[in-house]
From Swiss-Prot:
Segments traversing the membrane: 26-46, 342-362
GO biological process entries: endoplasmic reticulum to Golgi vesicle-mediated transport; retrograde vesicle-mediated transport, Golgi to endoplasmic reticulum
Cellular location(s): Endoplasmic reticulum-Golgi intermediate compartment membrane; Golgi apparatus, cis-Golgi network membrane; Endoplasmic reticulum membrane
Keyword Iron-sulfur attributed: no
Topology of this chain in the membrane: Multi-pass membrane protein
Pfam families: COPIIcoated_ERV, ERGIC_N
Region Disordered, residue ranges: 110-132
Record PANTHER family: ENDOPLASMIC RETICULUM-GOLGI INTERMEDIATE COMPARTMENT PROTEIN, ENDOPLASMIC RETICULUM-GOLGI INTERMEDIATE COMPARTMENT PROTEIN 3
Gene source species: Danio rerio
Biased composition (Basic and acidic residues): 110-129
Known function: Possible role in transport between endoplasmic reticulum and Golgi.
Stated name of the protein: Endoplasmic reticulum-Golgi intermediate compartment protein 3
């Protein structure tokens, strides 16, 4: 018994008899409010505990031989698919080789709705195929270039050959209906059919992980003196409207919290023949999920520049949308980690103890203030 009596001396929570306890409406109100506050703060702390903690690291990128995946979904509401070409270039201006891609062109009407149910597969750097079967023609034939023959190009067996001959002469290609090769391939029919249409380009590119660019521009693309240019003589600069809507553009896979700054970017061209350049800085990124899955991807920042392109074959800039990218030598690594359970318990205890203590102080203040006021009222009545 003596031991138990001595143990009672350490009780930090002395109890009072039930008969000496006073319950008030103010105390009940404080209790209810403090209980609600405890619940709100508890669920807030629980939500914070259940979210993953992400630790960033920065180091030099030493990876070699990797490919860069570019995810594209861009709409050109006033540029027909038959006019639009897509090319990927390296930093030296040469067309990239060994580019894996899966790009599609979807024709759109004036309201932005698909004209056909199936999108057309696009071959990077190649012109659209004709509607006729070339195997039905004599392979040894030599057709006319309509006065544009040169020593290097004496025979023009396709519409593209005639266009190339005209380009070399510096002639405008404005009368395809009078050229047998173009009539046979349905060149004018295709152009006229899609004249007032738009085009949606979507899919992906996988290019070498070096600085370069990819672009969307009207006209046939070709190399001239080691410079990549487009032949626009058959279009006329006044007919080129490069208004565009970038639904999605990213470099690699998505990961939690990623921000793609060009998504849902809508740019209306103020006049014809505009050249838009997006200068992109890519930061290689590794994201390690809590289950150990590793996602290799990229983040990027972007700056836009625009100007009027006055050149017909690229000597003063080309109308189009150009994305010029370069890679940072640094790599960012994000690692997901589960938050500490002991920290969660500590936070919950701090919430309960803190709210309980503050509520007790408020209740005591309310009670003693009410008692003091009541006494003054009673003294006033007595006098």
């Amino acid at each position: 018994m003596d031991a138990l009596n001595k143990l009672k001396q350490f009780d930090a929570y002395p109890k009072t008899l039930e008969d000496f306890r006073i319950k008030t409406c103010g105390g009940a109100t404080v209790t209810i409010i403090s209980g609600l506050i405890m619940l709100i703060l508890f669920f807030s702390e629980l939500q914070y505990y259940l979210t993953k903690e992400v630790h960033p690291e920065l180091f030099v990128d030493t990876s070699r031989g990797d490919k860069l995946r570019i995810n594209i979904d861009v709409i050109f509401p006033h540029m027909p698919c038959a006019y639009l070409s897509i090319d990927a270039m390296d930093v030296a201006g040469e067309q990239q080789l060994d580019v894996e891609h899966n790009l599609f062109k979807q024709r759109l009407d004036k309201d932005g709705q698909p004209v056909t149910t199936e999108a057309e597969k696009h071959d990077l750097g190649k012109e659209e195929e004709g509607v006729f079967d070339p195997s039905t023609l004599d392979p040894d034939r030599c057709e006319s270039c309509y006065g544009a023959e040169t020593d290097d190009l004496k025979c023009c067996n396709t519409c593209d050959d005639v266009r190339e001959a005209y380009r070399r002469r510096g002639w405008a290609f404005k009368t395809p209906d009078t050229i047998e090769q173009c009539k046979r391939e349905g060149f004018s029919q295709k152009m006229q059919e899609q004249k007032n249409e738009g085009c949606q380009v979507y899919g992906f590119l996988e290019v070498n992980k070096v600085a370069g660019n990819f672009h969307f521009a009207p006209g046939k693309s070709f190399q001239q003196s080691h410079v990549h240019v487009h032949d626009l003589q058959s279009f006329g600069l006044d007919n080129i409207n490069m208004t565009h809507f970038i639904k999605h553009l990213s470099f690699g896979k998505d990961y939690p919290g990623i921000v793609n700054p060009l998504d849902d970017t809508n740019v209306a061209a103020p006049q014809a023949s505009m050249m838009y350049q997006y200068f992109v800085k890519i930061v290689p990124t590794i994201y390690v999920k809590g289950d150990g899955e590793v996602v290799k991807t990229n983040q990027f920042s972007v700056t836009r520049h625009e100007k009027i392109a006055n050149g017909l074959i690229g000597d003063q800039g080309l109308p189009g949308v150009f994305v010029l990218y370069e890679l940072s030598p640094m790599m960012v690594k994000f690692t997901e980690k589960q938050r500490s359970f002991t920290h969660f318990l500590t936070g919950v205890c701090a919430i309960i103890g803190g709210v309980f203590t503050v509520a007790g102080l408020i209740d005591s203040l309310i009670y003693h203030s009410a008692r003091a006021i009541q006494k003054k009222i009673e003294l006033g009545k007595a006098s």
